[in-house]
């Protein structure tokens, strides 16, 4: 009995000591070898900007961007950490002359592979060349034999399309997806970190893709289901998402913030589509959302460390300016130059141009692209675009002599500004580069239509009511002016609407009269749902 008491006392003392030491043990830092860490580089919305380009930075004209400089940054990072994960959030195409060889050369996707990107996804502009164009591009990328990034998108609704019967375009894309190896997600091993990367196509992205024939599941539900599948079938350390959903100022409408809240198992979201430039990561729970802006002006860089509960903490985050100070990788630039020679030969030669040919000397300080759509005001960049529409139509061989009353240009279709100095063929193309025509030639064609005065007024009402929330839909018009009261009810804000002539004359709009309106095909497709 005495012995048992001694043993009990000793046992109690040992247990007490262990209990007291446990908190100290929990607070001791884990050895570096046991702590998992990952470095990530990322981009999105590069829009065929393989070459550097001239723009205004802090009031000064500078050359920024370019895949040759991005290659330098990626190589430098991989010298520090060979296991760096490199991701892209989609819309890698459509925005420069490079897009003219999209179908035949798959230049953008192949260059992403050459730079060392691991995974990307599809944005709405990958569908600009329609189903056949996207399918041809994917086949060209695969047939090149070069290393290309994995392509992931989890919410294509093939079941729904099959029930309705696949169209020829849908069949083409499905075949190309299968040949390329497009998946819902991929698992990437980076050192001791096993990461799953899922891709998703957002709701607003689909609304901005009038030529897309595919049907899509709800993004949140599709990602949720995919993450459950990953958790069930893959032993991964982290889950990242390359999303073409985007972020908005209104958190309740911000697609990737909604995704982060609804699917909390995601550790990291690379957020494309809205061209957001997040100086600081957005955090919801244990999920981080990051964006670095468009056109390769910046390269996103971050590091994450795994915590003891298995989740990841963002330990560093920066947007690296792809500036003149960064030395371009010469081998990369040589590849880009060869692609540009192909553009000259296969596209521009048909029009009697070369990419570096000077079309005009500019002494005007045009608005920056960032200013477009931010608020209701006259901008000289929007004005010259809409005036150019009228000039082009009235000097076309197809012009029937009926004067154009109104030209309409949404801010989202303007892709670049003009800097002072020489304006080249490439500059002009880049400023208005989207889409293709019925003939398959790059660039959305202009279209003429006749709208009633009532329909013109409705377009003005939509602009006054909606464009504050959807700045890419802000209209810049030549020939149409309106006044509005921002405090009135939606679709009842316009107080006056009239036509203006070049000589300054104001003309009252009559509801039942037809007016000659010019816009581009993309805008015409979008305006069709309004008028």
For the regions a language model picked out, list residue spans one by one:
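Generic structural marker for isolated residues within well-ordered, non-membrane alpha-helices
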Residues: 17, 256, 386
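Sec-dependent signal peptide cleavage junction
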Residues: 21-34
């Amino acid at each position: 009995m005495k012995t048992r008491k001694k043993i009990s006392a000793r046992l109690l003392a040992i247990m007490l000591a262990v209990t007291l030491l446990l908190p100290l043990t929990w607070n001791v830092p884990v050895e570096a070898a046991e702590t998992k860490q990952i470095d990530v580089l990322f981009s999105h919305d590069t829009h065929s900007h393989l070459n550097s380009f001239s723009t205004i930075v802090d009031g000064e004209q500078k050359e920024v961007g370019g895949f040759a400089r991005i290659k330098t940054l990626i190589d430098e990072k991989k010298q520090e950490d060979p296991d760096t994960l490199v991701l892209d959030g989609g819309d890698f195409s459509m925005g420069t002359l490079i897009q003219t060889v999209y179908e035949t050369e798959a230049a953008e996707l192949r260059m992403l592979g050459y730079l060392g990107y691991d995974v990307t996804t599809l944005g709405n502009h990958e569908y600009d060349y329609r189903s056949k164009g996207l399918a041809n591009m994917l086949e060209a990328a695969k047939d090149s034999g070069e290393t290309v990034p994995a392509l992931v998108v989890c919410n294509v609704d093939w079941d729904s399309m099959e029930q309705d019967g696949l169209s020829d375009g849908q069949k083409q894309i499905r075949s190309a997806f299968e040949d390329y190896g497009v998946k819902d997600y991929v698992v990437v091993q980076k050192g001791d970190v096993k990461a799953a990367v899922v891709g998703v196509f957002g709701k607003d992205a689909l609304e901005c893709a009038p030529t897309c024939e595919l049907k899509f599941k709800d993004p949140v539900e599709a990602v949720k289901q995919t993450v459950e599948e990953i958790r069930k079938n893959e032993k991964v350390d982290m889950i990242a998402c390359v999303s073409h959903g985007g972020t908005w100022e209104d958190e309740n409408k911000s697609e990737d913030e909604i995704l982060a809240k609804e699917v909390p198992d995601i550790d990291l979201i690379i957020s494309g589509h809205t061209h957001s430039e997040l100086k600081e990561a957005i955090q919801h729970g244990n999920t981080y959302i990051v964006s670095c802006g468009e056109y390769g002006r910046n390269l996103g860089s971050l590091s994450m460390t795994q915590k003891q509960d298995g989740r990841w903490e963002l330990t560093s985050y920066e947007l690296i300016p792809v500036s003149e100070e960064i030395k371009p990788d010469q081998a990369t630039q040589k590849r880009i130059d060869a692609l540009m020679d192909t553009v000259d030969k296969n596209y521009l030669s048909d029009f009697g141009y070369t990419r570096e040919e000077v079309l005009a000397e500019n002494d005007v300080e045009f608005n920056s692209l960032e200013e477009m759509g931010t608020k209701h005001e006259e901008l000289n960049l929007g004005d010259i675009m809409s005036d150019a529409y009228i000039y082009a139509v009235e000097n076309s061989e197809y012009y029937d002599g009926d004067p154009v009353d109104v030209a309409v240009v949404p801010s989202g279709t303007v892709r670049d500004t003009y800097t002072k100095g020489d304006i080249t063929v490439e500059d002009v193309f880049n400023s208005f580069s989207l889409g293709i025509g019925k003939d398959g030639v790059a660039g959305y064609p202009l279209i003429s239509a006749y709208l009633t005065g009532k329909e013109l007024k409705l377009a003005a009402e939509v602009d006054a009511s909606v464009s504050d929330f959807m700045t890419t839909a802000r209209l810049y018009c030549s020939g149409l002016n309106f006044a509005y009261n921002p405090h009135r009810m939606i679709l009842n804000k316009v107080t006056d609407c009239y036509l203006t002539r070049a000589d300054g004359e104001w003309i009252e709009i009559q509801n039942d009269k037809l007016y000659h309106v010019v816009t581009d095909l993309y805008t015409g497709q979008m305006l069709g749902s309004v008028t």
